[in-house]
Structure formats: structure tokens, C-alpha cells
Swiss-Prot record:
Belongs to the bacterial ribosomal protein bL20 family. This is Large ribosomal subunit protein bL20c. Signal peptide: none annotated. It comes from Anthoceros angustus. Keywords: Chloroplast, Plastid, Ribonucleoprotein, Ribosomal protein, RNA-binding, rRNA-binding.
Length: 112
């Protein structure tokens, strides 16, 4: 049987892993084994945090809408209920932007 050297394939695989972790500190960017572990950890963290970012922004928008609604003596819950009854279908991001940038428009949405 002929001898098969894995030099090129292994080098290419290691090079890709080290390229992924090039900005990391210390051994996490230079040593293959620790770089591989750190690269896997970073990918799982980024996947998890993409979902977390969506939740965090939704919480922020709801907080802003609630704060703006309470200036007019209404709670967030009653505001959303009234908007659905009147068939005003604005998402929370748009409502939060309107509450911050155009208070007059937001007060007309409240029905004041």
C-alpha cells in the first residue's frame, strides 16, 4: 500500500480554524487545539446571542412604549388592546420610534 501524507488537507483545515480565530487573544488565536475549542464556543455564542438580541430589542421597545403611554395615564396593555380593536397594526419597533420622535402623532394613536 502506498503511503498517504495528509499534509495539505490537515494544513488547510487548521488554517481555516486559525483564520476564524485570528482576532482572539493569546493562545486562542495561535495554538490549534485551543483555537478550535474557542472557535466552536464563539460560534455557539454568536448563534445564541442573535436570538437574545431580538428579545432584548423587543423588551426595549415595549419599555419605551409603556413609558410614553403612561404619560397619558394608560398602560401598555390597554394601549395595545385599543390599537388592535381599532385595527391599527403597527409593530412595536415602529410604535417605539413614533413615541420617541413624534409625541403628537403618538398621542393621536392613543386617542387623546
Amino acid at each position: 500500500m502506498t503511503r498517504v501524507k495528509r499534509g495539505y488537507v490537515a494544513r488547510r483545515r487548521r488554517k481555516n480554524i486559525l483564520k476564524l480565530t485570528s482576532g482572539f487573544q493569546g493562545a486562542h488565536s495561535t495554538l490549534f487545539r485551543t483555537a478550535n475549542q474557542q472557535g466552536m464556543k464563539s460560534l455557539t455564542s454568536s448563534h445564541r446571542d442573535r436570538g437574545k438580541r431580538k428579545r432584548d430589542f423587543r423588551r426595549l421597545w415595549i419599555t419605551r412604549i409603556n413609558a410614553a403611554a403612561r404619560r397619558s395615564k394608560k398602560s401598555y396593555h390597554t394601549l395595545i388592546q385599543e390599537l388592535y380593536k381599532r385595527k391599527i397594526l403597527l409593530n412595536r419597533k415602529m410604535l417605539a420610534q413614533i413615541a420617541i420622535l413624534d409625541t403628537y402623532c403618538f398621542s393621536t394613536l392613543l386617542g387623546d
